[in-house]
């Protein structure tokens, strides 16, 4: 949401795997409304730690562009990778939009909100409810 309370239209997303930081500049030039740094399904389990480190580095150096929303799609909170993702971003103190996939209950959203609130960090959440 924009600061004035109006909703921002989003027409397109482009996902960039955290394992491929060299693709970020192409993603920003794509014309997409949202550039999503992918830590979830687009990253193999053996590459999760390196992808997370890459994304933290990218967030610290990403170009500012008010017309593009930068989002990080983390792993589900119901596995170790998701918890590790959140801990990494809690430690950065960067403004952040988190895409939370595979949400099964409101408790998952509350946990994230509470963690970042306790750390005095503002985040935006994009909650994805998925079914099989």
Which residue ranges define each predicted feature?
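Short, Gly/Pro- and small/polar-rich lid/capping loops
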Residues: 1
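Conserved alpha/beta-domain cores
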Residues: 4-132
């Amino acid at each position: 949401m924009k600061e004035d309370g109006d909703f921002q239209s989003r027409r397109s997303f482009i996902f960039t795997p955290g394992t491929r930081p060299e693709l970020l500049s192409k993603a920003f030039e794509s014309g997409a409304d949202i550039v999503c740094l992918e830590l979830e399904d687009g990253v193999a389990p053996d590459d999760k730690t390196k992808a997370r480190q890459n994304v933290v580095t990218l967030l610290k150096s990403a170009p500012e562009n008010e017309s593009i929303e930068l989002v990080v799609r983390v792993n589900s909170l119901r596995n170790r990778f998701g918890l590790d993702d959140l801990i990494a971003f809690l430690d950065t103190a960067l403004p952040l939009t988190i895409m939370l996939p595979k949400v099964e209950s409101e408790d998952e959203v509350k946990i994230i909100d509470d963690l970042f609130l306790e750390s005095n960090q503002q985040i935006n959440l994009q909650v994805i409810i998925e079914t099989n």
